[in-house]
């Protein structure tokens, strides 16, 4: 998993994860986007 410092408030992390790891897979944990390659 790849934890980012991008805050997420009930929104999707897909766009963030697509930028970070190239795959729109992730979820919001403790207010941060965590991406799963």
Swiss-Prot record:
Positions of the record's site feature: Aromatic residue of the functional dyad: 36
Entry keyword Mitochondrion: no
Site (Basic residue of the functional dyad): 27
Alphabetically ordered keywords of this record: Disulfide bond, Ion channel impairing toxin, Neurotoxin, Potassium channel impairing toxin, Pyrrolidone carboxylic acid, Secreted, Toxin, Voltage-gated potassium channel impairing toxin
Top-level taxon in the UniProt lineage: Eukaryota
GO molecular function terms attached to this record: ion channel inhibitor activity; potassium channel regulator activity; toxin activity
Positions where Pyrrolidone carboxylic acid occurs in the chain: 1
Annotated site (Hot spot basic residue in hERG blocking currents): 6, 18-19
Gene3D superfamilies given in the database record: Knottin, scorpion toxin-like
Any Gene Ontology CC annotation: extracellular region
Expression by tissue: Expressed by the venom gland.
Domain remarks: Has the structural arrangement of an alpha-helix connected to a beta-sheet by disulfide bonds (CSalpha/beta).
Function: Blocker of voltage-gated potassium channels (600 nM of the toxin induces a block of 25% of hERG currents). May also inhibit Kv4/KCND when coexpressed with DPP6 or DPP10. In adult rat brain, it blocks the transient potassium channels in cerebellum granular cells. Blocks potassium channels by a simple 'plugging mechanism', in which a single toxin molecule finds a specific receptor site in the external vestibule of the potassium channel and thereby occludes the outer entry to the potassium conducting pore.
Protein name: Potassium channel toxin alpha-KTx 15.1
């Amino acid at each position: 998993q790849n934890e980012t410092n991008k805050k997420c408030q009930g929104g999707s992390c897909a766009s963030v994860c697509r930028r970070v790891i190239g795959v729109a897979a992730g979820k919001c944990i403790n207010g941060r986007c965590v991406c799963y390659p």
